[in-house]
Each structure stands twice: as C-alpha cells, then as structure tokens.
Regions:
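N-terminal lobe/hinge region of extracytoplasmic solute-binding protein
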Residues: 18-70, 106, 113
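Second-shell loop/turn segments in exported
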Residues: 29-34, 82-92, 134-137
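Extracytoplasmic/secreted proteins, especially bacterial periplasmic and envelope-associated proteins
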Residues: 42, 56, 60, 96, ...
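Solvent-exposed coil/turn segments that connect beta secondary-structure elements
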Residues: 20-23, 31, 52-53, 70-72, ...
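Surface-exposed binding/hinge segments that line
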Residues: 109-156
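Aromatic- and charge-enriched surface segment that lines or borders ligand/interaction sites
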Residues: 63-114, 147
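Sec/Tat signal peptide C-region and signal peptidase I cleavage site
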Residues: 6-12
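Extracytoplasmic
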Residues: 12-14, 21, 42-44, 60-62, ...
Length: 156
C-alpha cells in the first residue's frame, strides 16, 4: 500500500513518454524524425490537425477555416482564449493570436526574419514540403484571423 501511494505522488510530477527512440529536438520547425514528431505532438498544438487514426483535417488552434473557390486563399479563424504554458521563468502576458501564427510561419519562410537562424536555418520539413515557393503571402486580418495566399492551389 505504501509503495502504491508513493508511486502516485511520483507520477503526478513525472512525465513518462514511451518512444521507439530519442527525439532529436523539441522544436517542431526543425524536426526530421518520426520520434521527434511523435514527442512534439504531445507538447505543441497545431493550427489544424488530423482526425485520430485518419487523414481528415480537423480544427486545432484554428476553430474553422475558409478556402477560396480557386483554392489559393486560406483564411484561418483562430480560437480565442488559448493560453500559453506557464513556467516559473516565463510568465505569458497575452493569449495566442494571429501574430503567433504569422511568426511561426515567417521564422521558417523568410531568411530576413530575425529568428530564422536562432534554432537552425535548416527548416527541412517546411522546405521539403515546398512551402517557400508555395506561399505567396501571410496576412493578419485581425487579432484572430490569418489569411494565407498560395501561388497555386495545393494542399501539401
């Protein structure tokens, strides 16, 4: 009984993640391995996600999105009230918003972005998906709406 009570206390403070290998990093922008993608999927939320066990696109940080008739303009309507995580060394002062989505895209897309090389200039997944040539523009419509315009219709 005492061992069971102690185990409960430890598990409340310890995260155990079973994986086939060690993640190479915990920044999804430079992931190249399945182990890193698997580990990061438990930490980070995405704009859209896949239905569990399938390929149907479902809401994530975007509660909904519109696609233009020509398939080139995606307008993402972001969820309100999404909080950043808390840590003793960093206290977020605002909710997630359109600026964060734009930052996440531009730090991988634009070499002129001051954060392009902070973690690595090798944003291989983003590059391998052809995103730099596919994205024409990313615009903030309002605090919770982002418009992404593509050079051609495509759903990578």
């Amino acid at each position: 009984m005492a061992a069971l009570l102690c185990a409960g206390t430890v598990s409340a403070k310890t995260l155990v993640f079973c994986s086939e290998g060690s993640p190479e990093n915990f920044y999804p922008g430079i992931n190249t391995t399945g182990t890193s993608f698997d580990a990061n999927s438990q930490i980070y939320s995405r704009i859209v996600d896949f239905e569990r066990g399938g390929t149907t696109v479902v809401p994530g940080l975007a509660e909904r999105w519109d696609i233009s008739p020509d398939g080139k303009v995606y307008t993402f309507h972001l969820r309100k009230g999404v909080k950043w995580h808390n840590h003793r060394d960093w206290k977020p002062t605002r909710d997630f918003n359109a600026d964060d989505m734009i930052f996440a895209i531009e730090r991988q897309w634009k070499e002129s972005n001051p954060y392009f090389k902070v973690t690595s200039s090798n944003h291989s997944y983003f590059m391998d998906m052809g995103m730099p040539k596919l994205i024409k523009s990313v615009e903030r419509v309002d605090d919770y709406t982002v418009r992404v315009t593509l050079e051609k219709p495509e759903a990578p």
